[in-house]
Amino acid sequence: MSESTPEVSSSYPPPAHFAEHANARAELYREAEEDRLAFWAKQANRLSWTTPFTEVLDWSGAPFAKWFVGGELNVAYNCVDRHVEAGHGDRVAIHWEGEPVGDRRTLTYSDLLAEVSKAANALTDLGLVAGDRVAIYLPLIPEAVIAMLACARLGIMHSVVFGGFTAAALQARIVDAQAKLLITADGQFRRGKPSPLKAAADEALAAIPDCSVEHVLVVRRTGIEMAWSEGRDLWWHHVVGSASPAHTPEPFDSEHPLFLLYTSGTTGKPKGIMHTSGGYLTQCCYTMRTIFDVKPDSDVFWCTADIGWVTGHTYGVYGPLCNGVTEVLYEGTPDTPDRHRHFQIIEKYGVTIYYTAPTLIRMFMKWGREIPDSHDLSSLRLLGSVGEPINPEAWRWYRDVIGGGRTPLVDTWWQTETGSAMISPLPGIAAAKPGSAMTPLPGISAKIVDDHGDPLPPHTEGAQHVTGYLVLDQPWPSMLRGIWGDPARYWHSYWSKFSDKGYYFAGDGARIDPDGAIWVLGRIDDVMNVSGHRISTAEVESALVAHSGVAEAAVVGVTDETTTQAICAFVVLRANYAPHDRTAEELRTEVARVISPIARPRDVHVVPELPKTRSGKIMRRLLRDVAENRELGDTSTLLDPTVFDAIRAAK
């Protein structure tokens, strides 16, 4: 090490006081190793079951799992009622902070029970029954959580659609799920201004022939003007506000579907990931208690993710509430009205556990430490990272600046498909390594394998860098139960690559070090990870080609220090199209309009042609080399290797 390089620690053991009082002890690993199914049965029995399960796991129909067979429970009862019945009704369930300063609401568990019961009665009055689907297209407001729990209470599947998605994205999800009801708001606040939301909902519904949606339930959030369809559109405050606050929950089978959540797929069509009740809630509750070490009597937990993403489902709704924890929900952006907002919220509510994405951490780093340093963040006792691998520099900055150099930091790896966290340090046990998600949780089994499914040896310093595939070799309770309406796609997407081994293929590259720590390196397929959001290349390419001037498009993810990956597009224009100075910006805007602002390409390069194999396949791997200014890889299968001279000249 040179004298100019400051020495930094390679691992960070937990403080003695934290370790002494941690929920998870080292014995958990031994217990799970000795009898994995008995271990999961013990975790499941922390929930309230109306009918006990008779079998922990039925894997006879692999890769379709059945967990806690024969058991019956109600997810909403486990998240709300049982805490009230245990005498904790006065405990705050949700501190909600709106984006406009001073806009706040506090709901105790008793308040939440009344609101969820009213919403459940209202949905029943609208004719919804168990097994129906409800689309939820809302900003991060209490009604979003209430709507989710009301659906869970009735055995209705909710399909939450991120409020930043466009009408086209909403339309595709409504059609695929055949949703019977849409819950939305008049608008939402973004960067201090109200923006319409119902208008996009109206546009989506208008584009659906023989639309399955019978009613649209509208929350008044901003007061902005909007179109109204008499008979179809109903005000939330009228319908839910007048409903009875008394409702008796019905138990459902452990495998009863709980929700659909759509995620990007390499074919372009979003995949409806299906999760069920008992297994999902078991692992959700378990990981919340062990990874985040929650103490319901004293902790205030804040997961910054929107509920439109799986992190918002699992650690913004079900995880905290099934453990009886107090949580913070914040509607807006981190820089509204200024860059102090997140730190003001931590200080205001005494947040003790803060869970966010590396993109936001890197943004805070750019802003400078003087902003967090001007706030009292001493309430924080644990930090978490989610959504993408975190680089060691950001990890250390996060711990040192936000955590005061004293808090454990849990870097969690998981996916929409896994339902809950799978790989993470346990904060009272692990000596965490910056940049590593560490080891699979007790009860979880993962491997790093080569193309043949054989385990790779640990990577050692100075050795050739070998990246393997991250696979899961044993079923887990919160695993997806399929892709809605497409079992063949489920098998092909996750199980076909290593079908002879029975491994779940996560789609991420990873390596393992001599200590057994796993280092996840990111996506290896054609799904890009932009600020923790998975965007498929096919979706973006489709949006580009829809433009009248574009003949062909190819999109790749490239390294970006702020968002992990940024989208770089290469387009071939139609011969009769006259490009102009604003062509690239016009295409960027079009992608943002069709998909989401998140999917807006950072770079758009107009090129004369795209590199293709002799079979006509676009070689994105080589385009990625160009975008990253690297030397080209193997070009032997290219139809015309000279194409890159023209591409580089155009770039």
UniProtKB/Swiss-Prot annotation:
Belongs to the ATP-dependent AMP-binding enzyme family. Keywords: Acetylation, ATP-binding, Ligase, Magnesium, Metal-binding, Nucleotide-binding. One of its GO terms (cellular component) is cytosol. GO terms for molecular function: acetate-CoA ligase activity; AMP binding; ATP binding; metal ion binding. Catalyzes the conversion of acetate into acetyl-CoA (AcCoA), an essential intermediate at the junction of anabolic and catabolic pathways. AcsA undergoes a two-step reaction. In the first half reaction, AcsA combines acetate with ATP to form acetyl-adenylate (AcAMP) intermediate. In the second half reaction, it can then transfer the acetyl group from AcAMP to the sulfhydryl group of CoA, forming the product AcCoA. M.tuberculosis may use AcsA for both acetate and propionate assimilation. The modification N-acetylserine is found at residue 2. It comes from the Bacteria. This is Acetyl-coenzyme A synthetase. The keyword Acyltransferase does not apply. ATP binds at residues 387-389, 411-416, 508, 523, 534. Its EC number is 6.2.1.1. Magnesium, but can also use calcium, manganese, nickel or zinc ions. Optimum temperature is 37 degrees Celsius. It lost its activity rapidly below 25 degrees Celsius or above 45 degrees Celsius. Acetylated on Lys-617 by Pat in the presence of acetyl-CoA as an acetyl donor and ATP. Acetylation results in the inactivation of the enzyme. Deacetylation by the SIR2-homolog deacetylase CobB is required to activate the enzyme. One of its GO terms (biological process) is acetyl-CoA biosynthetic process from acetate. The keyword Metal-binding applies. The modification N6-acetyllysine is found at residue 617. The gene is acsA. CoA binds at residues 190-193, 311, 531. Mg(2+) binds at residues 545, 547, 550. Optimum pH is around 8. The enzyme is stable under neutral and alkaline conditions, while its activity decreases rapidly below pH 6.0. Changing residue 617 to R: Complete loss of acetyl-coenzyme A synthetase activity. Could be also autoacetylated on Lys-617 in the presence of acetate as an acetyl donor and ATP. Autoacetylation is effectively inhibited by CoA. If CoA is not available or the concentration of CoA is low in vivo, the enzyme can transfer acetyl group from AcAMP to itself, resulting in autoacetylation and inactivation. When CoA is available, the acetyl group is donated to CoA forming AcCoA. It catalyses: acetate + ATP + CoA = acetyl-CoA + AMP + diphosphate. Its cofactor is Mg(2+); Ca(2+); Mn(2+); Ni(2+). Signal peptide: none annotated.
